[in-house]
Amino acid sequence: MEMSLTDSDWDSSSDSGSSEHEEVEFSYGGRAQNIFSNLEETIGKIDEFLSFERGFMYGDIVRSATEPSGQSGRVINIDMFVNLESTHGKIMKEVDTKRLQKLRSISLSDYVINGPWVGRVDKIVERVSVTLDDGTNYEVLVDGQDKLVAIPPNLLEDSQYSYYPGQRVQVKLAHAPRSTTWLCGTWRGTQVMGTVCTVEAGLVYVDWVASIVMEGDRNLTAPQALQNPESLTLLPCVSHASWQLGDWCILPGSSHCDIAERQTPNVAAYNLNECHKTFQKGFNRNMQNSGLDELFVITKTKMKVAVMWQDGSCSLGVDSQQLLPVGAVNAHDFWPEQFVVEKETCNSKKWGVVKAVNAKEQTVKVQWTIQVEKEATGCVDEVMEEIVSAYELLEHPDFGFCFSDVVVKLLPEGKFDPNADTIVATEAKHLLTESDYSGAYFLSSIGVVTGFKNGSVKVKWANGSTSKVAPCEIWKMERSEYSNSSTVSSEGSVQDLSQKISQSDEASSNHQETGLVKLYSVGESCNENIPECSSFFLPKAAIGFITNLASSLFGYQGSTSVISSHSRCNDSEDQSDSEVLVQETAESYDNSETNSGEVDMTTTMVNIPIEGKGINKTLDSTLLENSRNQVRFRQFDMVNDCSDHHFLSSDKGLAQSQVTKSWVKKVQQEWSNLEANLPNTIYVRVCEERMDLLRAALVGAPGTPYHDGLFFFDIMLPPQYPHEPPMVHYHSGGMRLNPNLYESGRVCLSLLNTWSGSGTEVWNAGSSSILQLLLSFQALVLNEKPYFNEAGYDKQLGRAEGEKNSVSYNENAFLITCKSMISMLRKPPKHFEMLVKDHFTHRAQHVLAACKAYMEGVPVGSSANLQGNSTTNSTGFKIMLSKLYPKLLEAFSEIGVDCVQEIGPES
């Protein structure tokens, strides 16, 4: 309802507003206008502060914001500019961050060098220089004893900087302690107020990470954790690109004439000035002649970057707002100057550097370097260029350098051989123990990667020099290797060391070593062989068994079957959810069979008494003749020999003393459930001698990149089963074809408690079963779009970047499935030899037809539709498939498949 104001109402309102304005004017003593104008300006400043400015680091992978599904690139250079505001409200704009300095020369997490050792700064004890109000100057080592107490307001609410230049402090010292150095005047107890002039690192706690050690002295003792900063050398870093909003800094050489004064200072500056008035009288006369650099806070950032795109082109001065970060890097994406090797070969003398990448066609132009032995000249490097498929490349395992990596220069080969004759070894030892070797040599041998150029690595060394080296001349220090060095925290240790520092300007530290320079870690490396996320690495986490996600996933992909996590195997529930999925899976598979001459996949049931003694063990791996006079492999059976089972010798296996009646009964129930409800695409063998061991074979479902493949799993039931989930090992053959299935055989699934989960996602002793587990493998793990199984990747569903990566993942998954077929035919798992031969005898023609269809452009997983777009599949995929096709023909021919009429697809 609208309200209209009469003239009298308006006059009354105006009078009221006028009186209120006068009241405010009176209350604020004539400063109301100034405050209100400052308030408006402050709101504008807050909006500016909260404005989003996208930032990047060296080596980040990015895409163009205007073409998110296009090629990606790598950030190779950064220019950063910031707006600064001093504590007095004065501002500077568009300041290059290369001019900025931190409040201390050493900060937490910085890498430092002491002789051959590299460490990371873990804690800092500050040395503060204070000027008292009467002009007396002194330094104090602040070791947590409240020798200096900050007087409010404290401008820096940052735990990393307890003190900063210009800060007012109260000195709480009854006498001049050992850690105090008087620069001017003498100590008098009445001098308690002062101003901080400089703040530096007085003592540093270092966590020693690694060392360059000699071959004969692996027990080299690490330096003490508590160090004098003068004995340390700071490792170079690209700190100019790491500044953020709100960071405090110092601008060397800044003067009042360089600073633009605001016409009307903002509220924050006004308040700070009011607070500073309490100590300006004593501080100003010192500031005028002290030449102290003024303290600034960063209020705005702006970044320009240079990007090296996959096709080899370079864009300079790109505004960061025009780029998007690539959160999930495709495993088959490569970038110029990246070092690679061929997947299928183990030739350590052949490595390549990427020159250009066609992201759409998945092809890579590689410059190969091959070491060739020649009698006349010895070892010679031969260089050649080749365009290859991205699917046949891997990042070089030893040359995976990234920006800011800490690297060590290795001695030239043959410089020192511990097995050489005594004369040579003695000469080398004499060389390595010279005094300059323990000092300058290490500073010129430890550095940080700053770039890549023409197959070389650009390194900035600790001595300040920069050079380009071949990747084989340096070794990367893994930052995940941290030591458990003891941290000296006692007050006495700090005081003792500070006394030594005051007595001597330099700390002597001589380490004499002999032998070949190597990288040596103090601590133990991580047990999990999962590398840290960088610009070159694909993230290695795998998603768990997420039922709700699976439902939406299959709904999106057009699947007709949905698994229920509440599967029951009790006798009272004849029509369980598991049985429904079995029936649907079997129908889906049977409906996909188009060849009338193929095997009838109707399940043949074998009756097993509850005790498990009624199985005819003589029929192990026998073939049953069906109505078409064809033979097939039993779905479920018992075997005697399980000598090649992965868990046979496991220390977590079942001891005879641990066998209980309840456990045996539960296992027999599992056997009965498997016998009665296995779909015709799953085969299981249990071991008579070891009831806790099973082996299962799964057939890849139609419509997935795993179609027609065979996938084997070894299963062990722990003594606590079913209160603990079974242990599972996947027969990978050293290949990774799914985010949940690792090359090592590890299966990452929340249902197995090998991945995080909750509720129905995890193992339930009352409802979960082996059958449910196998169905989960087949329906949820080996699914239509396995790319989205990766943890967090479900957020990319429906997005251009995610769908593009999913297509690439499916192409590679099918290629690996074909490789696993070849491997399985030549070395099938025990007791499944006949299954492997029988399966591929009847499915070989279908596999070969699918390969031809994919070569013609049919999307992977939909080979039934022979009308495909020739541009659907990438050229890199077709290159690899054309190489695999003859190998498939050969492998199928070896088991008696007639492949004479099959003609390999054109490259």
From Swiss-Prot:
GO molecular function terms noted in the UniProt entry: ATP binding; ligase activity; ubiquitin conjugating enzyme activity
Disordered as annotated region, ranges: 1-23, 485-509
Keyword Nucleotide-binding belongs to the record: yes
Keywords: ATP-binding, Endoplasmic reticulum, Golgi apparatus, Ligase, Membrane, Nucleotide-binding, Transferase, Ubl conjugation pathway
Domain of life: Eukaryota
Chief place of localization: Golgi
Pfam families for the chain: SH3-B_UBE2O, SH3-C_UBE2O, tSH3-B_UBE2O, UQ_con
Active site as annotated: 748
Pathway: Protein modification; protein ubiquitination
E.C. no: 2.3.2.23
Catalytic activity: S-ubiquitinyl-[E1 ubiquitin-activating enzyme]-L-cysteine + [E2 ubiquitin-conjugating enzyme]-L-cysteine = [E1 ubiquitin-activating enzyme]-L-cysteine + S-ubiquitinyl-[E2 ubiquitin-conjugating enzyme]-L-cysteine
An individual GO BP term: regulation of phosphate transmembrane transport
SUPFAM superfamilies xref list: UBC-like (SSF54495)
One GO CC annotation: endoplasmic reticulum membrane
Domain annotation UBC core: ranges: 662-822
Role played: E2 ubiquitin-protein ligase that mediates E1-dependent protein ubiquitination. Mediates PHO1 degradation through multivesicular body-mediated vacuolar proteolysis in response to inorganic phosphate (Pi) availability. Negatively regulates the protein abundance of PHF1 and PHT1s under Pi-sufficient conditions by facilitating the degradation of PHT1 proteins at the endomembrane. Functions cooperatively with NLA to regulate the abundance of the inorganic phosphate (Pi) transporters PHT1-1, PHT1-2 and PHT1-3 in different subcellular compartments.
Family (UniProt): Belongs to the ubiquitin-conjugating enzyme family.
Protein name, as recorded: Probable ubiquitin-conjugating enzyme E2 24
Species, as recorded: Arabidopsis thaliana (Mouse-ear cress)
Organism ancestry: Eukaryota, Viridiplantae, Streptophyta, Embryophyta, Tracheophyta
